[in-house]
Amino acid sequence: MSPRSVASLSTLLICVHASLVAAHDFWLQPSEYWISQEALTPMTLQVGHGPFRQRSPIPARRITRFQAVAPGGTVVDLHEQLRLGQAAEDGNFRFTAAGAYVLVLQTDDRAQAHLPSIRFNDYLKVEGLTPALEQRERLNQMDRDGSERYSRCAKSLVQVGPAGTGPQGQVNKPVGLPLEIVPEANPYGLAKSASLPVRVIYAGRPLPGALVKLTDLDNDASPFEVHLTDRDGRAVFTMPSAGSWLLNVIWTKALPRSEETDFETVFSSLSFGFPPDHAFLQTSAYGRED
């Protein structure tokens, strides 16, 4: 996507009614992304950006998967650690082995959204949902109200121990979500890359033409960077080195007329972040030098 296209899209993202856009961004937010072994770490489920950001009110019955993929590839069920709606957290986790963990959360697809035609069309344009736009245009339905059923998927990268300690390979592997963002460079790796290439996987295959947004969660009124995936489902972002960050993507497909809604949509995110003093933690916060 050209700089001019990105600028135009960013303007559109800001101009569209904020509550419409913010309502669809959902992610896992650990209190810290870099933790020591055995540290009990709280996390929350977040939704929205800027002034519309809040704890997600999603009920526990809708969460079908909450796991951690450990550095060695073992899958740990974290369902019992959910504490939705508590005053300060929605759950917690504790890991013993050093390395990079992938937190994984998935919901069912029983939620529905019904919007007037103008708002639905704006939403489709902002999120780059071309299958829905093309169908509505082809069937002369741009003036009709729109509806979708939807599910949410979220991943979060957690590093246990200093940078580079323990296995890191799970960061770059899909975890079997219906829609997911797979980083092809490790944000937590010792060999720091200037770019962050990612691949979007939908229904087990690379997804071309998807709009992927990178947001600085400390300055989250609008995305920091936006790209469309290429024919291989890839997009390349600037690699962050400080703060908390969110990548998110949305995709949809048309449903048969016999269904209650017009489309089935999946919202997917990947969150990651760095300690306040990244360089210091790499050498001394865990009591040794590498």
Q: Where would I find each of the regions flagged by the language model?
A:
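Short amphipathic beta-strand segments in non-cytosolic proteins
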Residues: 64-75, 211-227
